[in-house]
């Protein structure tokens, strides 16, 4: 605490023994020990009060941030949020209504469809709205044509390979030569 070494402590003890005397030295040491104890207790009490005040300040800050989060999330309950979203979307379209042509739809569906689905430029056929690439058009044309089997493919039989009359010895020579 005071950074006193052993040599300094011996010097202080010798000076105290000479100045105070051997009779009164034990009483003085007892009194110095009591003062040191009181000083330590006061320091510990001060440190405890300081730590307690810091904990209270931290707890108050945590409580404040918790209250802010709770206030921010109070209106966002999961059911409340989903209800607001579904109410804003309205009723989903029925599958039967989607399959019907536009002329057979009820007037309410037509107004909703015209507001959401129809482009501003007028009515465009779905096929004309999306241009097809050459490969898509070719694939559709080929898929719609029936397959025709021509006579040249009906009777086609594989021709046998021409037979060679080489001996195995000649085949080995040819293989080595190449």
From Swiss-Prot:
One Gene Ontology MF term: protein transmembrane transporter activity
Keywords assigned: Cell inner membrane, Cell membrane, Membrane, Protein transport, Translocation, Transmembrane, Transmembrane helix, Transport
Compositional bias per record (Low complexity), positions renumbered to this chain: 155-165
Gene that produces this protein: tatB
Function: Part of the twin-arginine translocation (Tat) system that transports large folded proteins containing a characteristic twin-arginine motif in their signal peptide across membranes. Together with TatC, TatB is part of a receptor directly interacting with Tat signal peptides. TatB may form an oligomeric binding site that transiently accommodates folded Tat precursor proteins before their translocation.
Organism from which the protein derives: Nitrobacter hamburgensis (strain DSM 10229 / NCIMB 13809 / X14)
Membrane topology: Single-pass membrane protein
GO biological process: protein transport by the Tat complex
Name of the protein in question: Sec-independent protein translocase protein TatB
């Amino acid at each position: 605490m005071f950074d006193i070494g052993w040599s300094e402590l011996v010097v202080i003890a010798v000076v105290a023994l000479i100045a105070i005397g051997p009779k009164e030295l034990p009483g003085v040491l007892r009194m110095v020990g009591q003062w040191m104890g009181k000083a330590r207790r006061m320091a510990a009490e001060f440190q405890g009060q300081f730590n307690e005040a810091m904990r209270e300040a931290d707890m108050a800050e945590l409580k404040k941030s918790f209250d802010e989060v709770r206030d921010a999330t109070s209106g966002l309950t999961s059911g409340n949020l989903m209800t607001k979203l579904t109410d804003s979307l309205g009723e989903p379209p029925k599958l039967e209504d989607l399959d019907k042509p536009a002329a057979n739809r009820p007037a309410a569906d037509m107004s909703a469809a015209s507001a959401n689905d129809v482009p501003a430029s007028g009515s465009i056929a779905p096929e004309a709205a999306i241009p097809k690439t050459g490969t898509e058009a070719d694939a559709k044309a080929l898929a719609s044509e029936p397959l025709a089997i021509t006579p040249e493919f009906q009777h086609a039989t594989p021709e046998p390979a021409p037979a060679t009359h080489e001996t195995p010895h000649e085949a080995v020579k040819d293989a080595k030569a190449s």
